[in-house]
Regions:
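Active-site clefts of carbohydrate-active enzymes
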Residues: 314-337
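Carbohydrate-interacting/catalytic domains
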Residues: 17-105, 111, 144, 149-150, ...
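Positively charged n-region of N-terminal signal peptides that target proteins for export
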Residues: 1-4
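Substrate-binding/active-site clefts of carbohydrate-active enzymes
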Residues: 53-71, 78-87, 91-102, 108-229, ...
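Hydrophobic faces of well-ordered beta-strands that scaffold small-molecule active sites
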Residues: 71-73, 104-106, 157-159, 234, ...
């Protein structure tokens, strides 16, 4: 049983309203690639100062202590229940607690712009008022009640924040036209990609972070949610489209209000770790899609993790996933992209060094459909349950010291095998705890010989609970499209 979190403190002052958005019309991976490190023409250059350009700090005090063994769950409020409301969502909290969720990331809950709206209901990321709740979802009191309910069950809540752009009918468009980027003819500019080109996100206008007044207004809006609702942090949409130095400024200001604040960046640029606790692992996600489909072999993982080690270092949290709202809606479910290998891929995501695994709405009931992004499309919760699998993986994460997040976990060491390019194995150790992970992405079971296990002895296979004696050199039987995880 988790310890309940402190009750939400009432707000003392309301700050000015405002909005932000992201009209997704394609895979947002493009907005999260490492190429975001390059400054784009016409926007404030991202700083190359020593703080922003250095590897993520290994200082454990950078991250809130409560996040050491956390796992994260993305909530699509609109599609979660037939009602699509926060009150209806709150009824799922007991189930999510039982599943083992630590952090609930809510997709944007603010009102959606009407001008240039996509579809009937619009994009969650086309925000017309930063400090209000979409009436389709409920009222601010419903949001506060949800946060309080989550805290009572030991879960944290972070809110999706869209600083890069707002809806075209946000009040700032008329009240503060200087907050926005402009085309050569003076007209508002759609949100841009990492190369500075306008996207087809025609329902949102790009903000100009060269303006100090905009920066202060944006931070004020974020403070409002902390003060008024007691949320625990933010997932920042298209974070790579906003200058790193703004995020550093925002983190500093927000942590005065919430010292245990948690920030997640939709970006893969390592410099984001100057301000963010966690960044997206898009590159690993795309690699795992390719491995699951047989288009790449597991040796590619060696190159990935070597690069990750050199670029991010031990202090960073990296969010790994088999699905999220962008992947599901635009590229398909994990069943489409990974087939029978989706569970083995998730085991890797949950056990790899620096990883915090993400579970998306509906994955626990084998959701195979692509949820529509701009229309109502309720999740069918009667699908085949995978709750026991995901709960077991989360319990593995929670109980094994070697798998802790960031600087608290153990280093990842590849275990040599004769399994070829469809098998991958590694160990992680911390203090007297060792975890051995062996994965088989082939469609046939395999008996793998390994060598060089540095901590031989008695182990327990996590999922079957069978005892095993593992020698320095030995064999492991792995099911087709399967996994074996041994702990001691």
């Amino acid at each position: 049983m988790r310890t309940a979190l402190p009750p939400v403190t009432a707000a003392i002052a309301l700050l000015a309203c405002s909005p932000s958005s992201k009209a997704a019309s394609g895979d947002s991976a493009a907005a999260a690639t490492a190429s975001s490190a390059a400054a784009t023409p016409g926007r404030a250059a991202r700083p190359n100062d020593p703080v922003a350009a250095s590897r993520p700090s290994a200082d454990p005090d950078f991250h809130p202590s409560w996040s050491r063994k956390s796992v994260i769950y993305e909530v699509n409020v609109r599609q979660y229940t037939p009602e699509g409301t926060l009150a209806a969502l709150q009824r799922h909290l007991p189930r999510l607690e039982k599943l083992g969720v630590d952090i609930l990331w809510l997709m944007p809950v603010q009102p959606i712009g009407v001008k240039n709206r996509k579809g009937k209901l619009g994009s969650y990321y086309a925000i017309s008022d930063y400090t209000a709740v979409n009436p389709e979802f409920g009222k601010i009191e419903d949001f506060r009640a949800f946060v309080a309910g989550a805290h009572q069950r030991g879960m944290r809540v972070i809110l999706d924040w869209v600083a890069n752009h707002t809806a075209y009918d946000h009040e700032w468009v008329t009240a503060h036209p200087d907050y926005y980027e402009r085309r050569a003819d003076g007209s508002l500019m759609n949100a841009r990609d990492n190369e500075g080109k306008e996207t087809d996100w025609t329902d949102v206008a790009e903000l100009d972070f060269r303006n100090p007044a905009l920066r202060q207004a944006m931070i004020a809006e974020m403070k409002w949610w902390i003060d008024s609702t007691g949320i625990d942090g933010f997932r920042c949409d298209v974070a790579g489209g906003v200058p790193v130095d703004f995020w550093v400024e925002a983190r500093t200001a927000l942590k005065v209000r919430a010292p245990a604040l948690f920030l997640l960046a939709e970006a893969e640029d390592p410099r984001m770790h100057a301000a963010f606790d966690m960044t997206y692992g898009w590159d690993l996600h795309h690699l795992m899609n390719a491995i699951a489909q047989g288009k790449q072999g597991t040796p590619a993982l060696d190159a990935y993790f070597a690069r990750d080690d050199s670029v991010y270092g031990p202090g960073a949290y990296r969010m790994y996933f088999t699905s999220n709202h962008d992947e599901n809606s635009w590229n398909g479910s994990e069943f489409e992209r990974m087939g029978a290998n989706h569970k083995a891929a998730f085991v890797l995501d949950a056990t790899a060094q620096r990883s915090m695994p993400l579970l998306y709405t509906g994955q626990e009931v084998s959701m195979k459909k692509r949820l529509r992004f701009f229309e109502k499309d309720t999740v069918d919760w009667t699908g085949p349950s995978l709750a026991d699998f995901y709960s077991s993986v989360f319990d593995l994460k929670h109980t094994q010291a070697a798998l802790a997040n960031g600087p608290w976990g153990g280093p990842q060491v590849k275990l040599a095998t004769d399994g070829g390019d469809r098998v991958y194995a590694f160990t992680r150790s911390r203090d007297d705890n060792t975890v051995l992970v062996a994965l088989n992405f082939a469609d046939k079971p395999t008996s793998v010989s390994y060598r060089g296990l540095t901590r031989p002895g008695g182990y327990t296979e996590w999922f079957t609970k069978a005892s095993a004696s593992l020698a320095t050199d030995g064999k492991i039987e792995i099911p087709a499209n399967g996994y074996r995880v041994f702990v001691r």
